[in-house]
Structure formats: C-alpha cells, structure tokens
Design a protein with these regions (language model features):
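Short, structured segments at the rim of ligand-binding sites
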Residues: 1-209
C-alpha cells in the first residue's frame, strides 16, 4: 500500500460503514488532504463525530463542508495534548493513526482502553511506531518515525464470540468457540454461567453447553 494516496473517498464505501471514519486520521497522515462523506452504516441512531474533529483540529487539521462532504486538510500534522471528554474507541484510534505520521509527540488523556485500541497499537508498533500506554487511559505516541509494512495477527473478536455464546445459551445445544478471547470476556462469561450455561475455558477456545 506504499503508493496508496486517494484523497477523495467513494461515497458508497464511506456511508455504508461507521468505521470508515478511521480513514480520516490515516489518510491525513499519508496524503495531507481528505474529502469524504459523513460516515454511516449505523442503525442505532445518529452518532456525532465531533470528538474526532476537535482532536484532529488540535493537531493542525482544518475542516470545511463542501457540497455536503467533509473536507480535511493539514499542511503539516503536529503532535498535541488531547483530552477526550469520553473514552471513544474510534476517536482514540483516529488520533493514533494521525499521530504516528505527525511531527512531535501526541498525548491522549481519557483514551479508550478497549482491546481494539491495544491491537491497533500493537500493529502500529510492529510497523515501527513508538506508542506507550495503550490499554490505559493515557497514551503517548511519538510521531515522525518511518513506518514500514509488517505481518500482524489480530486477536479474535470478543463481541462476535459473545454473540455466538449467548445464541447458544438461548437456542440450546453445544458450541465450541475456537480461539475465543476469553481473557477479554470476563463479564459475558460470568453472565452466561448465571443464565445456566456450562462453560469450559481452554487454551484453544471456549466450550459452551
């Protein structure tokens, strides 16, 4: 992907998936400019993106509206001290993706601590980034480093595993959740047992009865 630098995102690719918003930080770091539709794909109601915009603005990004699209530009991204009023996973990830390409250090206070943030940090570090504190509410990203490609195996999805877990309990029968991240599923496993499920947590996954 070394040559990828598309500044104008296709509308259908953006409006169909909420997480497309994370392209904002990544492409600003790569291209310096992005034009994109407002993200969609979420059926739980209107979800604002102000946390993302305010955080990136502190890093030197300018935002305007152009024909209903969001236009972002940054002559030079720079590090900043950013305090998130709520621990948004998406905003934390967007800041990290922009910060690894920015000049100087970025400090996030009130960062999200979910496994998804830790996994992103792990991948970026494998690519040469310097990131400290992922998994806590304070993350420091040392920008300006040269990044390179890398192979990285992400952890299995705890939400998908939990969905199958409770589907099994509701429908009955036996299910083996291969590679389920049990270490990230403490509360769902406890609730499943309270509902009458019989669980066996093993290294290779979770057996559900």
């Amino acid at each position: 992907s070394a040559e990828v630098c598309r500044r104008d995102m296709r509308g259908e690719a953006i409006t169909g998936m909420r997480s497309s918003l994370c392209l904002l930080g990544a492409l600003l770091g790569r291209c310096g400019q992005v034009v994109m539709e407002h993200p969609g794909g979420c059926v739980i109601g209107v979800r604002p993106i102000d946390l993302h915009l305010k955080a990136l603005s502190r890093m030197g990004v300018r935002f305007t509206e152009e024909a209903g699209k969001l236009k972002a530009s940054a002559e030079s991204l720079h590090g900043a001290d950013i305090s998130l009023p709520i621990p948004s996973v998406g905003a934390t990830e967007n800041i990290m993706l922009a910060a690894v390409m920015a000049q100087g250090d970025t400090r996030i206070t009130g960062a999200a601590m979910e496994p998804e943030v830790t996994e992103l940090a792990g991948y970026l570090k494998r690519c040469g980034a310097r990131i400290e504190g992922a998994g806590t509410d304070r993350i420091v990203i040392h920008g300006g480093k040269t990044l390179y490609g890398a192979d990285y195996r992400i952890c299995s999805d705890r939400i998908v595993a939990g969905t199958y877990l409770f589907a099994c309990i509701g429908a009955g029968g036996n299910v083996f959740l291969e590679d389920a991240p049990s270490a990230q599923m403490g509360t769902p496993l406890k609730v499943a047992e309270q509902m009458g499920g019989k669980l066996c947590v093993a290294e290779e996954g979770i057996y559900v009865q």
